[in-house]
Amino acid sequence: MHPLALHCIRDCTKRLTRCLCHEGGGPHPILASFQTNFMRDRLTPYALTFRLPIIVWQALFFIGPLLFMIAMSFFLVKNYRMTEAFEMKNWARMLSRDYVWSSYRYTLLMAGSAAALTSLIAFPAALHLAFRTSEAARRWAIFLLIIPFFTSYLVRTFSWYVILAESGVVNAGLGTIGLGPYTMLNTPFGTLVGYIMLTLPLVLILQTVTLANIDRSLVQAARNLGCGPWRVIFAVILPSAKTGLIVAALFAFILAFGDFVAPYYLGGSKPPTLPILIIDTTKSGQQWPRAAVVAVMMMVTLFVIAFTAIVLAYRRRASR
């Protein structure tokens, strides 16, 4: 890099660090870490040598396809063939359709509900593993939580298809006490079950690791001051683990938002989620550009939500 450009970057970083500082006069910890580590090491040839494979991989298999997908959203399909162009017709058509926005709202609602429910279901178990079990037992529990990933997600989804069917295990159990049968497949409930099945092991692992790293002296001090169990959870544990809990919920939302299998096989695709809408659009006259519009909408939505969640989590953590 040109020496003048390097000098400008360092000067801007110093000015920004002086502007964003704590009340005591020290630099903001995030910016201080950025200045001391990133700016000092990244520009050296030694550091670039190790980071080059990651940069090349991301450029070839993420940034490149992403840019092509964005460009493809402006292409046109004529006689079932995609032609290069720069037209806003696909965007105007898709953004003006009510079914697109209905699918968008439904996908947001289902992914958000799945993230919230998964976090609530996982938290008591994670709390028990972090504070009530030994370290050896916790390791075995985490290993057992990894085992579901050894099997195909599609196979696990079909197993829930059998469980939730009208003649399945759940309705058979309810029938023994005079209840049912209930329709659970091809409903939003089936979609939620699939989302929770997909995200629960990962969220539980992340929450357990986060809670296990909380300083036990803080919890003990709160108990010595007379705080009850619920007071300890809300006043000490949740604020201390806020960043990890937000990241776990964020992963659940991202996985559910982009999932195709659960809403298609368990939810019946009525109404369709955005991934199902993408598949249906490509099957309808080879409209890949219109499907690219929906994909870009999903990418922008996930970027905004992920960026907002990360900023809020780390900003609050740094401000304590």
Name each region found by the language model.
Residues 225-227, 239:
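Glycine/proline-centered hinge or cleavage motifs at structural transition points of membrane proteins
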Residues 222:
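The alpha-helix within a helix-turn-helix
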Residues 79-85, 260-288:
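Glycine-rich helix-loop "coupling/hinge" segments at transmembrane-helix boundaries
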Residues 214-218, 318:
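Short glycine/proline-centered loop/turn elements that form peptide/ligand docking sites
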Residues 46-79, 94, 98-212, 236, ...:
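Membrane-water interface segments at the C-terminal ends of transmembrane alpha-helices
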